Every structure is written in structure tokens, then in C-alpha cells.
Amino acid sequence: MVSFVHVISVESNTAEIVDSVKMSGHPIHKAYLIFDSEESKKYVDEVKGTLSSLVEVEVLELKSDGVYEAVVDILRTVRKEVDAGNTVLFNITDSDKLTCLACFISAQISESKIYTKKGDSVIEIPTPPIKKVNEDKLEILRALEREGGSVDSINKLIELVEGKLEEQKKYMAQRARMSYHLNGLEEDGLVVTERKGKNLSIFLTELGKAFVAMFG
């Protein structure tokens, strides 16, 4: 059976959060409470106390000040729910700017719904569709992540992805294929490249790391 999982940001308004969940029009089987400040812990405990008598509740503290670092943390948590076939809903009723933006990006990447309470009603906020990344490009992103986020040459990346460099004729095909994929990844903002002498260094961007967290 599909479970409905609510990812709820918590800042300082327990009553609004609880009301928004009740008014969302969706069932709730599990909740993740996310927060990013010491001051919010009190309200996290209050919301947890209310919801835990009804559903399973987990808490996720976002410890970074960066938006994409927060997105990676959220997606690593959300991914297991999506992979299990569950429906994920983001509730940004009580969000500061960073958490709100991180939730919006996470909802977009994971193709989840996002809602908020506005006055006496709850509204769903549409997110634009995100461009799909094929398996060949995902494997490049995974390889960069395994290497700590960067490699110092295309040859190194080919070795990581394909296992070895082929002889001259096949090698040229390998290099052309890798260059083609890297151009697409760079256009999508998932990697950046930098020429260093004869070599081309490749770096995973923060958005690229978020894709690996969700799809890698």
C-alpha cells in the first residue's frame, strides 16, 4: 500500500503546522520534521508530540547554511520513500527562506508535491518539470561523487566510468562520447570544467550533488 509521507519544515508556529496537515486533504502515514536552527527545536518537539501519537515521526536537522547542502540532506532522506513507491508531500507553511527554497528545489527534483497554508485554506504550489538525466550521464555524476567531486582529466573520468582506456581507434570514440556527455551536463549546470594546460578538469556542482543524492 502506498504511504503518504509529509516533509514538514518547522520554525516557530506549531498550531499553523498542525492545522495545515489537517487541512491538506491528504492522508498522513509518516512525517519528517526538518529544521535549521537551535531556536526551532522547541517547536519541533511540540509538533512531534502532537503527530507521534498518530503517525511515525522522524526529525532531520539541516546543519549547513547553504541551500544545496540542505537539498542534498533532504533528498537523501526523501529518496528512500520515493524508491519505496510512497507519495511525498512537502509542507512549507512554517519555513524560513533557506528551508523554503531547499524544500522547493527538493520537491522539484524528486517530483513531489508541495503545499502551504494561506489564511483559512491550503494551496498546492506547482513546481516546473525538471529535465531528465539519462543513465550514461548519471554514471558520470556518480563517478565524480565517488572521487570527492572532481577529476583532473577526461581520461581519468573515462577510466572511472568505463573501467579502462581502449586502443587508439576505440579510445577516440570513448573520448568523443565522454566530451558529448560532459557538454550536456555542463549546459544543465551539473558539472563545470576548467582547462589546466593540456588537461580538462571536471567538477561536480552543488546541483550535480543534489542529483546524485536523489538518482545516483
Swiss-Prot record:
Q: Which InterPro entries match?
A: DUF6293_C (IPR054162), HFX_2341-like_N (IPR046260), WH-like_DNA-bd_sf (IPR036388), WH_DNA-bd_sf (IPR036390)
Q: Which Pfam families match?
A: DUF6293_C, HFX_2341_N
**Highest taxon, organism lineage:** Archaea
Write the protein's name: Uncharacterized protein AF_1987
Source organism of this protein record: Archaeoglobus fulgidus (strain ATCC 49558 / DSM 4304 / JCM 9628 / NBRC 100126 / VC-16)
